[in-house]
Amino acid sequence: MIDGAMQDFQLTLDRFLDHAAKWHPDAEVVSARDDGTVGRINYAELHRRARLVSAALDTLNIKTGDRVATLAWNTQEHVEAWYGIMGMGAVCHTLNPRLTAEQLGWMIGQSEASILLASSDLLDLAREVIGSSTNGVCRLIALGPVKDDNDSLDDLLGQPSQEIAWGGFDETLPSGLCFTSGTTGAPKGVTYTHRGNYLHTLKLLQADVTSITAREVVMPVVPMFHANAWGLPFACPAVGAKLVLPGRYADGASLARFIANESVTIAVGVPTVWLGLMDHLDANGIELPSLKRIMVGGAPMSQALMDRIEQRGIEVQTTWGMTELSPLGTATPPGAEARDPRTSGRPAVGVDLRLTDDEGNPLDVQREVEGHLWVRGAAVVDRYFGQEQLATADGWFNTGDLARIERDGTVLITGRSKDLIKSGGEWINPTEIETVISALPCVSQSAVIGRSDPKWGERPLLLVELRDGYSPTDAELLAELDGRVASWWIPDQVVRLPQMPLAPTGKIDKLRLRNEYCNA
């Protein structure tokens, strides 16, 4: 036996805030408030307050592994609660305020959360959530000041009898719970672990992934209730980057003002967010000189939108991932030449990919072919909350995406297997049609779904949201597909929508579109 060993240093998430408080104590966390003011604290103060949250939860009899739900936007108070819950070994179950009370009530019934921490502006919704849930033991506590007699977390912080309950537990314990968006079916719970989130954070910080350093000012527009804001509230304190939290407002005007005022250098979110920002900048002749890079994921970005952003000297960094991956799987490296916006870069270290056939068998050739994308890694889901084994025995998880891996290892997401349209026994890939149509200057957003057809089984239906000032005919829109896709792929009909329906994630809500138009 070789003498000597490395220390047993548990990879738990409280260590990121410990590190920030010790080595980057003055780096700022800035938060937009509903009243138009801006809250500012530093990592030293965030660390102090998060530890007090842990102590308060301990006095409320929250134990290791207990679920505590949050109903809040990206704010300072939410980050404090988030770290306070995870820092004492409890599980932070983040809820999406854009869902209905019934949907959220079902979720806290599933998780059996014993406390719901809600932003002051969301207390009415929170009461409805608890009232509609089968969870009869969930206690409501407000984040921030309240005007009624509702319990407030602020009143529970720093009581003399409290002892700090912080860290000192096993890295394999669960840290968080996020439910998938449910845009194509019932939401499923994904349980994160401290070890998985810690390793995911190290993956994010690689030079060829986010390349975030203490010199950056980072604004995650993606909410904390979507896969932990893609892990950025862990990554920023880990390196001492200034963290800018936009609160509830993600409209173009609000984001432009916040980016300018706080000199944001990196902003992160789904394509619809950046569409709104570009429209606002164009309409008002505004420039954002501090903004160097936009990271995009969650849904495909059109070539037209990518071009609009890059014409302003802002780099677009495309990524691919999903809730089940914590969420990042691949990323184009910062500074890479602009390519097809569907290109999502290479997998980061700790992520393994493979392509399979329809039956799940690995393809003999893994380059320059299309297949079903499977993934495994330290931050990849093994099974959904309350369900049996999901991944294969050797750890492979079926993402549901179709992909092509190029010769150089970059990944091109070509569609979703559940979105494929079967017409006359042959498959049509809606993503290829959407890519062509969304690149047109007249189109703001587009979606293609399968519609029932008595002869062919299904036929593609094109739905578009046009940009203001444009009125192309159906024939003009469909003519753009000639020679770009097979002739029998061209949709038979075009439906114009005043506004494309979006899921709470900011993605196009194809489930709603199918429900409304599939049999029309």
Residue map of PLM features:
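AMP-binding/adenylate-forming catalytic core of the ANL superfamily
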Residues: 99, 116-118, 257, 377, ...
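Conserved AMP-binding/adenylation subdomain of ANL enzymes
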Residues: 198-217, 227-265, 280
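Conserved ATP/PPi-binding loop(s) of AMP-dependent carboxylate-activating enzymes
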Residues: 330, 346-350, 361-394, 426-428
